[in-house]
């Protein structure tokens, strides 16, 4: 009799937990048809299980200035560089650092590329952006620390552990996407690159307004130090970049601080704002949102130019003689070209 009661309670517990899991999964944003940027971080874990394919030469970390401005497909086609972009919307520097830690659980790339715009933020910003980075990470100590470093005053750690606590009110906003992608998702990026082929020229770009203090904050700089130290410890070359986005404005005073830091620590720093002509960037044709980000044309131009820098200034090599990697990229490039054709067709 006692045994039957035990079985009954176990069955009830399993049924309850299963129901809560399904409900939580239903209520969580799917980031497939809308606000697709929220899907980028999680897609990394779906890379090939074959370690020879999974081992990327270059991993980008940072905000939208990496995942919208660089194309790993071009780096592979032109230079045989196997790369991935671990970018997310308004990714803060401490989030980038913990994503670097997370990446090193799976692989040790030769080069880490970090976009420096996020140095402007010294404190947590917005929950919506936090979630687009943090929710996609697999659970680890790095994720826990990233959540703790990122939460605004109104956020609670348990809401990240049990997302149903945060998303219970989405019940009235559910749509067909929530049901269609309940148990599976659809890839929205190409090795972390978010493709946009449409064109909106850069016109009347606002000038930067004077700031009371141009110094990067102590907290932000401490995470840049941690990133530099971790890369050095693991034998990884850290490359700092500033993407050629015209807005948000990049101040000369910020540029001076990054240049000084790179020189002090022996790091390669590339400011693409100063190299748009060399890269062939035309802001009347190569941006889809008036200069904030590159479109497909601009990203491919920038990637060709950066690929040359990577081959000359880092230890990356041409891996197009590796059969398993070539086979994987053949499939990736087919999907890339299909997406490319479809986007151009819709214009």
Task: Mark where each language-model region is.
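Alpha-helical transmembrane signal-anchor/signal-peptide segments
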Residues: 29-47
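C-terminal regions of proteins
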Residues: 253-328, 337-347
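Catalytic nucleophile-elbow at a beta strand-turn-alpha helix junction centered on a G-D-S/GDSL motif
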Residues: 52-70, 293-296
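Hydrophobic membrane-insertion alpha-helices, especially the h-region
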Residues: 8-28
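Conserved, well-ordered alpha-helix/loop/beta-strand core segments that scaffold catalytic motifs
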Residues: 111-123, 182-279
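Membrane-embedded segments
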Residues: 61, 65-147
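Secreted/periplasmic serine-hydrolase-like ester/acetyl group-modifying domain
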Residues: 129-234, 320-347
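Acidic/histidine-rich helix-loop elements
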Residues: 85-89, 212, 216, 291
